[in-house]
Amino acid sequence: ISQLNAAILQELGKEHTVKAFNFKRQYPEFLFPGKTQYVTPDDEAVPVESEALLDSIGPVSWIKSARKIKEWNPDVLIIRYWVSYLAPALGFVARHMSKKCKVIAIFDNVIPHERHFFDKPLSKYFLSGIDGGVTLSPEVGQDLEELSPGKPKTVIPHPIYCDHFGTKMERKEAENLLGLEHGKKNLLFFGLIPEYK
């Protein structure tokens, strides 16, 4: 998610004045299964200057974030949406922009693959605060239409990150790099991948 956000920011920044606002905390530690929810110096991430304001579980930060973004006076606010847990915070910010500011969401998911009883109501709350959306797949576009019929939307398939992950490598070169025998079938293990992926 962060790689695509950085790429979008870079591209839009070529022709527009852009500013990134960020989470100071996305998830409470007990809900976050990974090692860290922050970019570390070891990450090969595109550096993005951003202002960390929003705490997903801190309503006071929602008010401060909305105020700070509104003071910046954007014509368009682009919000990334991927999990309903963040809908209260993101929906609050979306609702508190000026009338002239269009609020557009980029959706990885409208309804998560691992569903909970609260997903649809929270997503509907978020959707009612935005002007339109970009979905990264047709299936997510269908979910958006189901929860918010007629909401302006377009589908732009999720891009490949050539700049972030490098160019395609020839098989022999990869086998040499990994110390594998040439021409053999190799099993690549990418960790535990949920069934829906």
Question: Which ranges hold each PLM region?
Answer:
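Short hydrophobic "strand-cap" motifs at the C-terminus of beta-strands
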Residues: 136, 156-159, 189-193
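Active-site proximal beta-strand in glycosyltransferases
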Residues: 76-78, 94-113, 134
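Short amphipathic alpha-helix
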Residues: 1-12
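Acidic anion/phosphate-binding donor-loop and adjacent secondary structure
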Residues: 116, 142-146, 159-177
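N-terminal strand-loop element at the rim of the active site
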Residues: 10-71, 140
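Nucleotide-sugar donor phosphate/pyrophosphate-binding loop at the beta->alpha transition
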Residues: 102, 109-129, 138, 142, ...
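Short N-terminal targeting/anchoring amphipathic segment
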Residues: 50-57, 64-87, 102-106
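Conserved donor-binding/catalytic core segment of Leloir-type glycosyltransferases
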Residues: 181-197
